[in-house]
């Protein structure tokens, strides 16, 4: 019985670490330029962020070489901030924008960065297009609470080309 449960667990978890066929992680990724605070500009709807506005993510280096993750958003329904702490690790080499992230014990999901921009500040990336394990998970993150319309259009175009249902994007309010 334990062996069967282990096999099922491995099968289920491996499915969470995949990525859509059409998505390829960025190469030449530099973690130091990714650390810090990001604002959620757009996303596809999913239960763990439903109803949240002013969503942000903060990434910092862990002592074991991984990444500490703090996601935060305001729930209008509950009139309070909600926060989730997690951890992320590179799936392959650290120069590839492909990480696994966990907010609950040993269960990891894919975090695939498929587009980045440094903008004028070479010290940090300015926006990131991110996919999860399948085409139901998609985010546009930026260093500022708003971005130029051209960035949003690029995100929509690149995401649509990769099979994401961009007509279902949500644009959470940022203050």
Place the predicted regions along the sequence by residue.
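Sec-dependent N-terminal signal peptides
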Residues: 4-13
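A beta-rich soluble binding module of mature secreted/lumenal proteins
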Residues: 16-175
